[in-house]
Amino acid sequence: MSEQQTSQSNFGIYSLYVLGAIACFVFFQFFYPYHLFYQEQNQLFLSSWDYLTTYLDKPGWLACLAGDFLTQFYYFRYAGPIILTLCILITGHNVKCAVRDADIQGKKTAHIVAFIMMILLVCFSFHYDYRLCSILAIAGGASVFRVSTKLLTSTRMFLKKIEKMDDNPSAAAGLGAAHWITAFSIIVSVFVCHWFFGNGVWIYGALVFTGCLSHIKKVGTYYRLAALVIPFFLLMLSKRLYFCDFQTLYTYPGIGKLVKPQMDLEKTFAVDCEYYFGNYNKVINIVEKTENPDQYMKFYYNLVMAQNGYLPDNLLGFQSNNLGTFEKLGPDTPTLTIKTLNELYWVLGDMTFCERATMLANVCSPNNRNIRMVKRLAEINLVKGDYAATRKYLRILQKTFVWSRWANRAFSSLGRKATTDEKALLQQYIEKRPFINRKDTLRLNENCHTIMCELAESNPNNKIAIDYMLCSDLLLKDMGTFKRDYDAYYLKQKNVSYERLYQEALMIYLAGTKAKPEEWAKYIKRQDILKRFYQYNEERGNQAFSDTYWYYFDKAEVPKLNIN
């Protein structure tokens, strides 16, 4: 009967493990996948001995190496949630076995501790900056405890056999050689665990400390406690070896934060990732279905609209729109803003500022490594025609798993024996070359309006840059600058379509300057909009005109400028 109850109890416990694993996979696959995509894009793993040796620069090199190696597979659908779930399960299993090896009393104590640890790891993983290597560090700390415990058990059994074989035990055995060996093992294990698994050493220390407390009255326990405390203090001596502060020394590769699922941020990452993947229709659907999209969602939505030629038609679609043209990079600029601005300059055509923003985004990534930005640097130099620099970045990408195939194709496209497909890959970047900034890019400030003017002067048919320029003027309600830019750049295009937004803005300017009828006839080409303008003047501020620039001009607040 007792065995049957035990069997039923074990079945119930392991059923919880299975259900928990399924729940974890389902959540991260169907409700939280873009956090994992974001992590994959913000790291870089190269199959190169020179690169792999850089992991020795910080404690926990084995956990970081294994974590970054596995993180690169987050790029593939289903792979990320599977890897994360398995790593959490393995960590829970290691902790459970380690608690049992620590001989802590309680039949279900090991399972309870394992469940608590796995729940904590899932909660930590809700944060976008919690890396997989931190989970592996915990698993590694428990593994070191298990291995060292088994080695000590074997050593003690060996010493007992020697004592039984010897009728006159040696003096060393009489003094308790086993206790000294245990103390020495703990000291060595602390240093080894810290070297391999970083902050996983705290898991090892907690297991040793708890095991000692549960057997505090046994002989030799205080030797073990002393052997545990001393090396933790001696770890401070490795500060100069790793060139890091004490906090990093004891917490690397990172301690998690208890956060609830960041579903709003998940939508932001969804828009960011789908734009990166080229799924522009998904970007539009996500943003339009969101009740209150944040500034980053609006930013990518506008990028898509601008590339389709619909930016003026959708500028007033949100109460407070975000074009990104008022942002300036500085010490207080949010990390997400830094990582998105390169997309703006890429679309506008300014490769110099695109490269600058990309470099800064790379610097702001963990360990200054970002595979998405390395690929963008290769693309920038393809557009610029700097093939020597292009090859440098392509050689880096050739050593990755995800982008090696693309890098090989791009590398071959630069050669004389390029295939048709390889030439087509290069051609899409060559077609972007006429839109780059041909003006002197050395300037004292980062004025996006100046950049857009230079782009329009470099290529009068750069409609995207002109639309962004005019729309930025209108968001600021700077009618004088808008009129000047309209005359200088918009009217010089080959095909002028007289968008409704610009016509409405011109009516405000002409009415404000009391222009003559000849001026009205010169600029106002759409009589249907002019009739509605007369109606608005009779019902000024009426909600029925909320889709017009006239209403925005009267009611909306001017966006605050970033002056970093």
Protein language model regions, located:
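Start-transfer (signal-anchor) and selected internal transmembrane alpha helices
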Residues: 1-24
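Membrane-embedded helix bundles of polyisoprenyl
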Residues: 19-28, 110-126, 132-148, 182-194
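Membrane-interface coil-to-helix junctions
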Residues: 26-85
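Transmembrane-helix motifs of polytopic, lipid-linked glycan transferases
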Residues: 85-103, 119-120, 140-150
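Transmembrane-helix signature of polytopic, membrane-embedded enzymes
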Residues: 99-119, 158-159
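Internal/C-terminal transmembrane anchor helices
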Residues: 224-242, 257-260
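Soluble catalytic regions of membrane-associated enzymes that act on cell-envelope
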Residues: 249-434, 441, 457-478
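Terminal, low-structured helical/coil segments at or just beyond the last alpha-helical repeat
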Residues: 515-564
